[in-house]
Amino acid sequence: FYAICEELGIDYPKTWTFDCADPDVAIDAESFTYPLIAKPSNSARYDLMDFPGKEKVYEVQTPDDLLRIFDLLREAGYDRELVVQDFIPGDDDALRSLTTFSDASGEVRVVSGGRVVLQDHSPARIGNPMCILPERVDRIIEDAKRFCKHVGYRGFGNFDIKFDARDGSYKFFEINTRPGRNTYYVAQGGANIARLLVDEYILHREIPYQEAYGDTLYTCVPKKVIERHVSNPELRDEVLDMYRSGHTGYPYDNPRDTFAHKLYARVTFMHQVQKFDRFMGSGKNA
């Protein structure tokens, strides 16, 4: 991914990789500038593992932290690469999510995205967007289009991006090569997700270009979580206005679902208050 970004001139965090399966690999931890972020390169393999100290993404504050994390993954039997990256400063609201749908030629036919208001802060799910405000950014749309066209990408792709206030750039972290839960904001913006798949893969119809940006907030958290844990006052007020006006959408809500599913969805939704208080503190704007 990063080699392609380098080739196309797409901004990305400075990145190093270390093979956990190679016994001869040694990390010169003192040579880095901290803080850093470390994460496994193969999430599919990593998700199947269970061991004490496991986290989805590791914050690395010191050389000792980096060596400890590398040894932890090795000893747990993780046999793929550890990705180490420059830490991009900024709160959750510096993050951007962009979803594309491309045809067989790699041309992006549908694009949607937004500004992350809050992400999950629990160790096992850190980084999963929990609230996204619709926002269109020309620069990241054009970068994503060039990437998809260059590799001939087909279908749904979800790009994780972060605004770097140090130089005004948008750094691309990765592409998730499948639709995820937050792909729901594509539907909120007016594009039918199922129809796109049917038209492209079954009916082989030409899909007209569409930018699916609506005026509905994607959210998996109650209003109280926003009140307590969004520190940016302007952003917080904008998001709360959308709650008050009813311009919100929760991906687990469906009037056709069974009572049991509706109950599960509502309990999961309300549980986020307790969960965010646990991992971010219970004080207002903690």
Regions found by a protein language model. Name each.
Residues D199-A286:
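Peripheral (often C-terminal) accessory segments that flank ATP-dependent C-N-forming ligase machineries
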Residues F1-V83, A104-S105:
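Active-site nucleotide/adenylate-binding loops and adjacent lid/helix of ATP-dependent enzymes
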Residues C20, V60-S122, E135-K145, F163, ...:
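Phosphate-binding site of ATP-dependent enzymes
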Residues V83, R154-N158, I207-Y213:
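Flexible, glycine/charged-enriched surface loops at secondary-structure junctions
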Residues K149-Y184:
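Conserved metal-phosphate-binding beta-hairpin within the catalytic cores
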Residues V117-P129, N176-G190:
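Glycine-rich phosphate/pyrophosphate-binding beta-alpha loops
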